[in-house]
Amino acid sequence: MAKKVAVIGAGVSGLISLKCCVDEGLEPTCFERTEDIGGVWRFKEKVEDGRASIYQSVVTNTSKEMSCFSDFPMPEDFPNFLHNSKLLEYFRIFAKKFDLLKYIQFQTTVLSVRKCPDFSSSGQWKVVTQSNGKEQSAVFDAVMVCTGHHFLPHIPLKSFPGIERFKGQYFHSRQYKHPDGFEGKRILVIGMGNSGSDIAVELSKSAAQVFISTRHGTWVMSRVSEDGYPWDSVFHTRFRSMLRNVLPRTVVKWMIEQQMNQWFNHENYGLEPQNKYIMKEPVLNDDVPSRLLCGAIKVKSTVKELTETSAIFEDGTVEENIDVIIFATGYSFSFPFLEDSLVKVENNMVSLYKYIFPAHLEKSTFACIGLIQPLGSIFPTAELQARWVTRVFKGLCHLPSERTMMMDIIKRNEKRIDLFGESQSQTLQTNYVDYLDELALEIGAKPDFCSLLFKDPKLAVRLFFGPCNSYQYRLAGPGQWEGARSAIFTQKQRILKPLKTRVLKDSSNFPVSFLLKILGLVAVVVAFFCQLQWS
């Protein structure tokens, strides 16, 4: 008899969790509190309590080829970076292709998830839901929480003395939808993450002046990278990931600074991060430097105090006649339907094994999907999480002891702090390629490079030097997809397809890049064996 699994949320994590459950022969039921799929990526004009919210102009920060699910490439005519409506279209195509909607109960709110009295032996959960004012309860063999972490706004008003005196308008960035109504105003945006930067840029085109306050500074990257390719298809390769892991810390920090400053000198713009950490999640925005050059946006330090109409900053400067303050200060974790002890966040540390499993449960029948912030696309990340989780639920994969899991949680947190810092916004940060490989290894889907070097050297070179895409994790192991190799080698074609809207005369060049990659791979292998010989 198939195990019954409760999937909470029908956003990206919920949809892929449904598919993974079906692939493994489990019986899923998804509870979605709204009337449609898409989660945070479905734009609505009205902000709803308990639901993630985006502004109308949101475009993905990760490209389509690095964001698609591993056995379902996005249509080749889709743009590389998708408007939220286009991404929602992909989710609809995906849900229809794999017939997922029949598993979803819409407009159904999960009120509570509690262990059954015999949990220590059964591992079962009692899930109480509400729909149309009527409560129902059901018992499930396992639970997958797929609600994400972008719906409870974090507004640290106590950190802004004088906010109670401020006569202008202030609100969290989740309430921002479009620039209408802000024309001619002087606006202060607090927080320079992706949302804060996007909003500042958009408002700067019609506002009188926009100021953006950043505590530590930030790196700003363009979506356009080498030779015009999407940034993540160049940045996220196994070769680059290996270099970051084996080179000394000071060298890695220098390399990152050089790479980030290729586009523009961040120090000259007052943006260079002022901390000791190797990595800080960059802001993806193609317009920030130009808006700074135009004077439409001005970078400010931390707000020290607010008056009725002005903002006083830590460097002693004052900006008068502020009309609006927008807090782009992130989100707090909240799972009101869970017991407090189930998913604990203490001192900015999430007590989940590999950001997924509570370590203290007697039975491994509960998991969080998508509760992570990788330096890359969340979609392939959530998919690998769900693939592993469903195999754990089936008993095909097993978790280590509680002690081993707790040691991993502590060690992972120490590494996260060393790389990214201790602030709340960095709580879920992790290295992208390393984490994907880690999950793939658990399910037996990580590519075997030593074997591929002899069996399929062309593929081995592509996997090592090319983009670390999701297709790689369908080449072998459970869930193998026969189209994976072809998808890897036709990736460039799908990247360029939406750009080639003007016919040009054909020109061919000698493929020296492939030969250089072969030589580079040989050099890496030789260096590795030499190191073994001398160690």
Swiss-Prot record:
One of its GO terms (molecular function) is NADP binding. It is found in: Microsome membrane; Endoplasmic reticulum membrane. InterPro entries: FAD/NAD-bd_sf, Flavin_mOase, Flavin_mOase-like, Flavin_mOase_2, FMO-like. Its main location: membrane. GO terms for cellular component: endoplasmic reticulum membrane; membrane. It is an enzyme of class 1 (oxidoreductase). It holds the Pfam family FMO-like. The lineage of its organism: Eukaryota, Metazoa, Chordata, Craniata, Vertebrata. NADP(+) binds at residues 60-61, 195-198. It is a single-pass membrane protein. Its cofactor is FAD; Mg(2+). This is Dimethylaniline monooxygenase [N-oxide-forming] 2. The keyword Repeat does not apply. It comes from Macaca mulatta.
